[in-house]
């Protein structure tokens, strides 16, 4: 009898231990409500040092996209969410020659030297897509609106239209419409749990990228209720295998690989808000280094490339456009009691 009691007690201890362990695991459930919009601001800073025939060419690019997401309809684990580009801010500096565009301002400085690029930026603003999201594994399964998007961006430029039709693959569009969903764990996690996610981005005649994210759940952010996930991203480039018909160049060969971050780059971190059921903020930083062999006019040219890139994403229940009116006005403080 005593052995039976000990056995029952042991089983109870195991059951209680399992319960405690399950309770200690953080859950990451996306919370969507039909027609209740939420917003994101995605900013990317890229610095490239390109060496060609012994000469260095430095290019800097800053881009900010303002997104509005509106849940439209649900079918089991799948949601169709409407995505709209509410605003675009771009700044490109090629060896001291700046090009800027800001859709949030009425008066644009213009760019007489590259009006086609300015038109491209303008056409990005207001673009809309219907994104089908599987909430079980956080994968974007489908994006509707590609044909209209490519037609809009390529308007007025045969060369741009040809390039976009080749590089704007279904995979490329899915990843463009997926700034944070792929960073969310697809199950409960305990402190110091680790996991991986892999993606392949195929850009047709530009080549493809294999991306690996290694995640570690670190628990609650100190002093906050946000869940902290640290990320170690890595990327490997593969040269294209298909012909670059209609393009002025062809990437014949190349290798690009991730390297340790520069001292000034921010570490990659995701902060998840369990209350809103969305990512509060995310930072993903990369450094790449390698070389490409580019064929132009039948001549092969070796290009050495070093690139640093940092992308930040911020989420909100209100539009993040400058000067936007909050959907829910702040409540005035109660008068002091007499």
Indicate residue ranges for each PLM-predicted region.
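Bacterial N-terminal signal peptides that target proteins for export
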Residues: 1-9
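Signature of exported/secreted
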Residues: 23-338
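Bacterial N-terminal signal peptides
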Residues: 9-17
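Sec/Tat signal peptide C-region and signal peptidase I cleavage site
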Residues: 18-22
